[in-house]
Amino acid sequence: HSFIWLKEAGVALPVYCVQEPQVPLLLSKATNLFKLFLSDVGLLAAMYADGLQIRILNKENNINFGSVYENAVAQELCAHGFEVYYFNNKKQGELDFVIEFEGEALPLEVKSGKDYTKHRALNHVLESPNYHIQNAIVFCNENIEVKDQIFYCPIYMAGFLEKRTVPELSLIHI
């Protein structure tokens, strides 16, 4: 019940696991498996060890920003109205996020280091004939780049993903 309270209070963002990255994602949602992100990445940074904030402002490069970046992406996706999930499979690995985008499952990976092109789980899912996934996005510390089915984008671009809805049908009465 504590997790539900945190969600209802607007403090936390639950991201549920899906058993397969196929639309509709809701049908394969595992209600007992989820990750919990903070609704404000500033809260996460404040909870870290003393002095980390100064090290971040000083642009020290020996800090693992993975959890901060992943939290920031989760926050942006939720703010833009996406139902956010993640995928975890023993054989294929874990995808940080999966959303429905333009009627398809879109895997999203968040990478904070220089090895942003290494993503075993993402490669497995893209190569799987079972999932029919066309594209994926990797948010990283680099410039925009496209390699095959993967779009590499700077972390801040997570804020530019927009949920598109089907336009409403307008009935004309004669």
What are these regions (language model features)?
Residues 40, 150-159:
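Helix N-cap / beta->alpha transition motif
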Residues 105, 166-170:
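N-terminal cap/leader regions of alpha/beta-hydrolase-fold enzymes
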Residues 112-153:
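Catalytic cores of nucleic-acid endonucleases
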Residues 104-106, 135:
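Structural motif
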Residues 1-102:
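Accessory nucleic acid-recognition modules appended to NTPase machines
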Residues 144-146, 157-167:
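A short acidic, often aromatic-flanked loop/helix-cap motif at beta-alpha or helix-coil junctions
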Residues 86, 107-110:
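Short catalytic-loop micro-motif centered on adjacent basic/acidic residues
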Residues 172-174:
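Conserved small/polar residues in nucleotide/adenosyl-binding loops
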